[in-house]
């Protein structure tokens, strides 16, 4: 039978186990990213979707972020700018809460991505919004 192939650049996985509905064909899992979104930073493949997965689990953040890749000397650096939620600015102890969020994000990014990243918390509504696909990566490296 014919096999139709498309080069979508979607990253997913094949699931060989039968479906609960009884079908026995190989299934495709959820799309976890796109190969054309991949960044290579110090030899590590980093996808914006990985960063987003870490950010979703942190209270007090908005779903708006920007990745800035730069080169200092011979090393690539990754800076992650994340918008804070306005809810954080409604009570006391804001500075301590912000410091805790920043430290936790740095640790989580290291654990999940395998590289150290610079984490910068930015004020609400400072990261550009776009109508179409969000442009989340700024690559300043001269390759």
At which residue positions do the language-model features occur?
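Active-site glycine/GP-rich loop and adjacent strand/helix microenvironment
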Residues: 1-143
């Amino acid at each position: 039978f014919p096999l139709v192939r498309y080069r979508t650049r979607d990253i997913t996985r094949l699931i060989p186990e039968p479906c609960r509905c009884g079908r026995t064909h190989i299934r495709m899992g959820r799309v976890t990213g796109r190969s054309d979104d991949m960044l290579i930073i110090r030899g590590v493949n980093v996808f914006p979707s990985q960063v987003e997965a870490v950010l979703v689990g942190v209270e007090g953040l908005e779903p708006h972020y920007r990745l800035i890749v730069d080169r200092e000397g011979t090393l690539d650096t990754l800076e992650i700018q994340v918008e804070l939620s306005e809810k954080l600015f409604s009570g006391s102890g804001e500075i301590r809460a912000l410091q805790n969020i920043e430290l936790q994000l740095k640790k989580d990014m290291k654990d999940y991505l395998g590289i150290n990243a610079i984490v910068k918390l930015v004020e609400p509504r400072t990261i550009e919004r776009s109508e179409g696909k969000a442009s989340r990566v700024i690559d300043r490296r001269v390759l």
